Amino acid sequence: MEINTDKYKNITRNLEREMINLNPIQRGGIIPTESKKIIYEYWDGYSVCDYCSGRLDKIETPPINEFLEDMSKFLGMDITRPTHGARESKYAVMNSVCKEGDYVVLDGNAHYTSYVALERAKLNYEKTDIEEYPTFRVIPESYAEKIDMLEDSKKNIGLILLTHVDGNYGNVADVKKVGKIAKSKGYPFLLNCAYSAGRMPIDGKKLNVDFIAASGHKSMAASGPCGLLSINKSYEDEVLETSKVNAVKELQMLGCTSRGIPILSLMASFEHLIERVKQWDLEVEKTRKVVNELEPLGFNQIGEKPRNHDIIRFETPILDEIAEKDKRRGFFFYEELKKRGIGGIRRGVTKEFKMSVYGLTNSQVDYVINSMKSIINELR
């Protein structure tokens, strides 16, 4: 067998080193330099398992067990387990607290992975209503309506799921209202915090949630794949049931999950997370500044206003107009940004785009704003 492996050698990526990255799916997962130094010794497979007694969450060296206890405090929950991502966390809950054929009531902004997870768990779903263009906000009262409808139809409801912050518009849902509805109706409540936990303050108990699904690589300054599942103790027996064959292994975790760099990167970045969520108001302020400065150019921010999250989605008819006469067509914006050392915007997109300035300095934010202004003013 002959395989040419030259293409796999010297693979490089310079986006973070040489450019300002505006990709909202990546801004929250950028690992601080000090964390990169700590994880150097854990490159190898199963590197965290040197002193394992049979289960990942009980490892004392490195102190994974203590980290998970501290993370529970950070999220305002009782018990935390590492997973490979928020989608795996959601599936673990669905596959344990629901019975086959049950309904999951979820919001109209739910991520595709919520649907994939419930399909894999052989569940049905009922989608709640959201506001129409241009806000697209979740309507909490719709949960009560959909629950009543399913109950009247004698359908079994297994779970209430809410996307805390959706990836399309960056809207922050009213968790307390939905949580109150879930509690009053007597159903378990799962909050998808893929775009919130690690970026902004979260307290599960204050929010009335039973489960939190978090993403390490999306919002917690960690390498991927890595996530967390945080639960209330009342659901410990259901969600963390152990194997009949190997009594120490938890079924929904398939024994153990993140066994190397991802979990260590999350641990190494924990101090950074604790400090950065304290600056959330400043992140929102920077985001609102971007919107206020760019809308007069012909950008139209969609989603709730004013912004309460760092994800920004712009409709950009002005870019479409420029693309019609520019010989580069829809690629001009990407190329002009690249010339100015800015990346993370999808190539060829001019009708609309998403961006985030989360974690950037004020001077970097100003540079991004001024760069976009100069592109529009030069080419319009």
From Swiss-Prot:
Q: Which family does it belong to?
A: Belongs to the SepCysS family.
Enumerate the Gene3D superfamilies for this protein. Answer: Aspartate Aminotransferase, domain 1, Type I PLP-dependent aspartate aminotransferase-like (Major domain)
> Which sites bind pyridoxal 5'-phosphate?
A86, R87, N192, S215, G216, H217
Which keywords are on file for this protein?
Answer: Protein biosynthesis, Pyridoxal phosphate, Transferase
Give a yes or no for keyword Transferase in this entry. yes
Task: Name the lineage.
Answer: Archaea, Methanobacteriati, Methanobacteriota, Methanomada group, Methanococci
Record HAMAP family: Sep_Cys_tRNA_synth
Q: Which residues carry this modification: N6-(pyridoxal phosphate)lysine?
A: K218
Can you say what this protein is called? O-phospho-L-seryl-tRNA:Cys-tRNA synthase
Per the UniProt entry, what species is this protein from, by scientific name? Answer: Methanococcus maripaludis (strain C6 / ATCC BAA-1332)
